[in-house]
Amino acid sequence: YQKKDPVADRLPWTQHQTLGIYDAVDYALNAANVPVVTYGGELDPQLLASTTMQKLTGELQVPLQVLIGAGMGHEFDADSRRRFMEFHLEKSLVGRPQSGQRKKLRFSTRTLRYSRCDWLRVEEQLVCYQPATVEGEIDDMDTLRLTTQNAALLRLSREIAGTVVIDGSELELRGAAEGLLPDVWFQRQADGAWTVLGYQESRAISRNPDLRKRPGLQGPIDDAFMGSFLCVRGTGVPLHPAAGGWSERVLQQFREEFAKWFRGEVRVVSDQDLTEQMIAEHHLILFGDPGSNSVLARVLPMLHGQPVEWNAERIRVGQREWSAAEHGLVLIHPNPLNRAKYVVLNSGHTFHERDFRASNAWLFPRLGDAAVLRLSAEAENAESAVQWSGVFDSGWKLSTE
């Protein structure tokens, strides 16, 4: 209903990848796990959202009921409202299945932010921001049979079945890991076969020693603002005056937009006032460059992925380089000072005033996991031109393209 041509108006590659995080069409399969009814007025352009989902779920053999109000615009008619509420009342009286009662599951996600469905959790994807799908059913022999796509690491509640068959690999479930953990971990091997992890292996992998993308620590940049965050402003001398002015404008824009659209106050401290407790409790949003922000200068050489360099001459990300006098760096990464939290450089939300005003359909990530922006003192509302943007893989590394 936004009237965008899927070819002519196609988004830049990075935006197109992360758009799927919030695009409902990529989650149609999940309607198999919960009763769904939707409504649209016959004359409402947004009825297209309902009918599109009905078409997609139909192709997947998933039930989805659509109520259409005859002659109505963007509002209910009395009969449709009654039927809509009766549907929800009936289903709420039944409630969701209790633990262990669900025998069949069909689940898909584009992001580890939304990784759990009942007794299943997708802990890693093979390819980030692409659909990871798990479908399965518990048979009469107490065996859970699963098929997967784009999943690299799974957790299953142990009590649901005695054994599990994942993509043809038959493995112990209820008695796995010596029966000492509530969930059992399963890892995909390079040849596509799956293995079950023992007690010590499970404890180790749950700590994420190799710093993989995991639920709640998977990007993109905007994901950092779904938890407690703290902005850290530099107090030193920037490598270039333009970089200092740019980072201040970005911070000011974030504060103003957050106050207006989220009705909250962005917390800001100086790099000299940052404490260990703050590092432990918050995602850190660092503004400045290695000259002006001592915290940024400290964490930059410690990033886990491909080398990131920022000095007075250049910004280098992997094999790519830009002039530091004319460009600024934006990225998200696990914080080397607290690997359970994010660190973000020079960015608030990557959507802005015009997107808030347009529609909530426009509030999707614009810069992926990392970007280099051209500094521009003339850019309205501190916006800068994107010279490059990209996404990290499951190991927080960039491709070598």
What do the PLM-derived regions correspond to, one by one?
Residues 140, 149-157:
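Extracellular beta-sheet-rich ligand-binding/adhesion modules
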Residues 17, 21-24, 43-50, 77, ...:
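Solvent-exposed, acidic/flexible segments
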Residues 30, 34, 56-60, 87-95, ...:
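Structured segments of extracytoplasmic/periplasmic soluble domains
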Residues 145, 156-401:
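Solvent-exposed alpha-helical segments and adjacent loops
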Residues 1-29, 33-34:
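Mobile cap/lid helix-loop segments that gate and shape the active-site cleft of serine hydrolases
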Residues 39, 43-147:
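C-terminal catalytic histidine-bearing segment of alpha/beta-hydrolase fold enzymes
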Residues 2-7, 48-51, 67, 78-80, ...:
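Short, solvent-exposed loop/turn and secondary-structure capping segments
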Residues 1, 20-21, 32-43, 225, ...:
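Cell-envelope and extracellular/periplasmic
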